């Protein structure tokens, strides 16, 4: 496929994120991915989900896969920023993107179905067919991508097809549609075992979509400044 930016676009105003976007600090990438849209082509349909929740991971901290060492399965984590790293979690597929520096990456934790002239209601219907509820019925739109494995299931993303691959603007890419969260929630990551840097505030949530992420950081009992921090559009992330 040609590397010419015009010839490689799936439609004229598509804005695929370049590798340079990903080849930066994982915390920065994780935060700036909020509002971007994952697009995956299935036949003549472009399935799409807005990224609403991410988690950053680093080689040197104990919560990351990379901290366990290099293996052939984990090789995408050690490649340049912009490689796709997929693995199985709780019986489902999970989507990650490598970031700047060997072993650093961002996990796409949750999304929300995105509708526009490219990804229309037919695409949404396909996503609901791919990820029905436990009774086989169409899953509620707000819960369709509310978790890392639910997201991949609804988007039709599979480990064997995409692990260690690069983005392909004709098949799978992250689109900059011009959306920016007005407020971002920063909190500790989910599901990290005790003693493996579970306290690190490397999780980012688009505050407007907090109710649709894996676990609502604004739920009853959570206290600002203790359990999470609210960041404005220009505020620096916490270290």
From Swiss-Prot:
GO terms for molecular function: alkylbase DNA N-glycosylase activity; DNA binding. The keyword Hydrolase applies. It comes from Pseudomonas aeruginosa (strain UCBPP-PA14). Its EC number is 3.2.2.-. It holds the Pfam family Pur_DNA_glyco. Signal peptide: none annotated. InterPro entries: Formyl_transferase-like_C_sf, MPG, MPG_sf. Belongs to the DNA glycosylase MPG family. Keywords: DNA damage, DNA repair, Hydrolase. The lineage of its organism: Bacteria, Pseudomonadati, Pseudomonadota, Gammaproteobacteria, Pseudomonadales. It comes from the Bacteria. It is an enzyme of class 3 (hydrolase). This is Putative 3-methyladenine DNA glycosylase. GO terms for biological process: base-excision repair.
